[in-house]
Amino acid sequence: VSKLVLIIGLICLFSCRALDFYGDADKPFFNSDKKEIANPEAADSLNVVTFNIKKARKIELAIAEMKALEKKTPVDIYLLQEMNEEGVEAIAKGLGLNYLYIPIAYDKSDKKDIGNAILTKGTIAHPEKLILPHAKWQNQQRRAVTIGEVNIHQKKILVFSVHTETVAMSRKMRLDQVDSVIRYGQEEASHYKYVLIGGDFNTAFPKYSHSVVNKFNSNGFDWQTARVGSTAKAMMGLVTPVNDYLFSKGFVCTNAYAIRDSRSSDHFPVFATLRY
């Protein structure tokens, strides 16, 4: 119990940064949609990585790690969280990717925007920002989801890059955020054969993790990274939660793992191969 109280206290303490919230549903958006980058070839599977790069502070190291992964297994879509525009542009340039980046707030302590991004070897259409319910009482910060239609392998995929609230918010409110993501995915699923939802759901404790997974499963989304194990580390490695997930419709997972030798964040990149 004492460890639990300490963890919650530390999370609350470090989540009270001064932020300016971007409340407009249609701005600011940053995107690159270069047709010459896009891979028009058909394929039987999609390689995906979700990765929270901790306020985009170690971008050069993250890019080096991504390039090392690309040499072994080319990645078609990256879902990134805690990003700023400079970090997204550097990754896109370094790996030859198109991107959609939607900041949700300006972090006054870092003097940079922070938000979620989708990067891909395909093209991205129909960008949207889904603002999630409930503001954090400490600083009135809101969370949002970056959504776009990725066209790759002659397929159209509705893609979500998600970052929901920490335990600084009540469990019920955090589940409301999860419900909002699922509801939007359900509404749009009729227009898409393939839906991909991934990111950092801040499920620091197993009971809450089970609740999140059950919500997605009961609404027809498969947890494609169920066998990956821990995806993050905290308190000098004493706590190793499952925070990062890939859920989908229309795919079958053939391989998934966390890259635990990564040193560019307190989260591990989570990789999955999804067969169409």
Language-model features: where?
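Active-site-proximal segments of metal-dependent phosphoesterases and phosphodiesterases across multiple
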Residues: 164-181, 203-217
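Soluble or luminal CAZymes and related metallo-dependent hydrolases
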Residues: 58-62, 83, 140-142, 172-180, ...
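Metal-dependent phosphoester-hydrolase catalytic domains
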Residues: 17-36, 186-195, 203-276
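Active-site beta-strand/loop signature of hydrolases that rely on acidic residues for catalysis
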Residues: 46-52, 66-91, 119, 148, ...
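Structured beta-strand-rich core segments of catalytic domains in phosphoester-bond hydrolases
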Residues: 21-33, 79-158, 162, 258-261
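Sec-dependent signal peptide recognition
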Residues: 2-8
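N-terminal, active-site-proximal structural segment of metallo-dependent hydrolase catalytic domains
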Residues: 3, 14-94, 106-110
